[in-house]
């Protein structure tokens, strides 16, 4: 929140081979940097900046392991990630592993990868081209984990499309939740307005005051409530927009139910 591009530019220049990165590189809304062993994408949005790091997963962190550590394998280093300017709103580790998903044999090692915790599971695509699993929880490193399991022949294009939609879906879900504190802050004022309205109605029915007096009090009550809601109008509008985007990304993934498993869509509802 309120992070200047200059601070982001200086931080990006600390990456390997990026010391000469020109400030003008951040004039647009999108930047992709090629790094030793991977790449980083920088995106500027209306309310947030997204950093997406692409890199191979070490061989010893795949299916068959339990709660494998991931931060220590980052090609940019955990200190660089933790020093990204601004407040962290969303932190996700998305891992794509290859396995045969024609049967459900992959489910047991995939659950083990999450340490046996309860997870949501869905098949994706009309033809069930991949499967996704997540527990929607923050791991010890402060990141939420999403596991995608896809056949070995999955193309880079399809892998990228699946990953992007999942990351956007969860990002928009968490951004939509920014409206929750505003709703909680407004709740006492709404409750007070309801009590005042109830009292006004009772006075009107009992003819305890003139119609004009009651009308003036009603107008004053309405004005106060309108001021309170106007203060949070942007946040609530943004919440509705983010929720619509989240639902759109989920629909684009065309998830399918696995017998006996809670789907991502069911959890999100």
PLM regions and their residue ranges:
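Short, structured coil/loop segments at alpha-helix boundaries
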Residues: 5, 15, 19, 155-156, ...
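Short secondary-structure junctions and interdomain/linker hinges
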Residues: 19-23, 172-173, 179, 200, ...
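Short small/polar-residue motifs
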Residues: 34-39, 128-135, 239, 261
